[in-house]
UniProtKB/Swiss-Prot annotation:
Keyword annotations from UniProtKB, A to Z: Glycoprotein, Glycosyltransferase, Golgi apparatus, Membrane, Signal-anchor, Transferase, Transmembrane, Transmembrane helix
Gene3D superfamilies named in the record: Spore Coat Polysaccharide Biosynthesis Protein SpsA, Chain A (3.90.550.10)
Protein name in UniProt: Probable glycosyltransferase 6
Function per UniProt: Probable glycosyltransferase that may be involved in the biosynthesis of xyloglucan.
Segments on the Cytoplasmic face: 1-40
MF terms in GO: galactosyltransferase activity
Example of a GO cellular component annotation carried by this entry: Golgi membrane
The organism of origin for this protein: Oryza sativa subsp. japonica (Rice)
Amino acid sequence: MAASETAPFGVSAASKGGGGVAGARAQHGQLAVAGRVHDALVFAAGAVAAVLVLLATASFLSPMPVTNLVAFRSLPVSVASTSAASAAIDADVGVRGGPGAAGRTFYDDSRVSYAVEVGRRGGITGWDARRAAWMRLRYPRGLNATAAGRERVVMVSGSQAPPCRGEGGDHLLFRFLKNKVDYCRLHGVELLYNNALLQPRMLAYWAKIPAVRAAMLAHPDAEWVWWVDADAVFTDMDFSLPLHKYKDHNLVVYGWNKEVYGERSWVGLNAGVFLIRNCQWSLDFMDAWARMGPASPEYARWGSVLHDTLRGKSDKESDDQSALVYLLSEHEEKWGAKTYLEKGYFFQGYWVEVVDRLDDIAARYEAAERRPSAAAAHLRRRHAEREHERYAAARNAAVRGAVPGPAGGGQSGWRRPFVTHFTGCQPCGGEPNKIYSKKSCADGMNRALNFADDQVLRNYGYRHKDPLSDEVRPLPFDYPAAR
């Protein structure tokens, strides 16, 4: 899977000032006669009235106003505007920047490289201080955090540039991408989806490291960078990352301490989804990780080391997951101490353990909302999508009180599984791992994607006809009490 930075989603703002009728003005210093002034004023009034009528009409006809495009936070947005408009935007968020901004930053240092250069001496140093200096210069009034005062998060994902070999693979990747766009929009997360190879020798699963590293430099205002494999689905649109839980850590991976540090099992964690802090420790860690990959002259040797060291590893290929287990277990004090192995919820759930439970989980949530209580009635109220997080918190409280079992979204928890990862299904390649059938993968992916999509469509008054159907039906008023 290749991943790299794509061109940003561009929005051209209309130019302000310059042309148009702003009032009758005499040219070349000559005074206009009174009649011409009167005519010009009448013309100006008529033009303004016409513009107002046009804008009013457009507000009804346009399915997506320009303001929504500019505010669309799930993709990077490029806004072309006049200096006056830019100044207004910058003043609103407390930013000082642009091509003519005063003060040099790390961007002006030719020694700072976006690329992963295995074997190159030096690398980026002093990143924490460099990033802090950039923040002070560009956000003199302090960085405005995202909704609810959370630290800023940039999600990075990606797929290969050429078309998929597997039938329907491109369509599935599109649906996986839509799922990520939906989640990011609901939670104020910026999404960077990439399909170019940043380091030609770091192929397949190794391509994530150059993409994440480049994202750190491109987004110094982000505290966290969140890698999510293309074939991972957000199956709980209500859940937000518990960032406070990781305040003393720099890397979050789904895994088990006993299997990583005790048994040194190569499947003691999964590297398909991880959260990494934007700091010097992380840059150093990714440099060490990359040195075990295919861009390193020591790649073959590392394959033998991992085969001989890690329990259960049958091949001599140095893959990203085995390398991660090795780094954490071999250098526990240096790398492991700042890594949080998350098992309290499905930071990424194995799809085989998840998909057959989704129908029961959906029924559990609906039952909680059908209860004859004022709280359940409030949850059934139709509301704007912008209010999603408040309703999500109330819904989780209602389900938690109605369903026995621990929280977390694991096999015995009451919560929906947060992320369902279709490891081994290879939707783009077309040939899944031999232990899975094509039908089980296809049905599982459709079921998980529709399960997630129903949570989004509810804000628009619809849901899928059934778990495997693309057809949608309108929801009755007071759903799910009325069905």
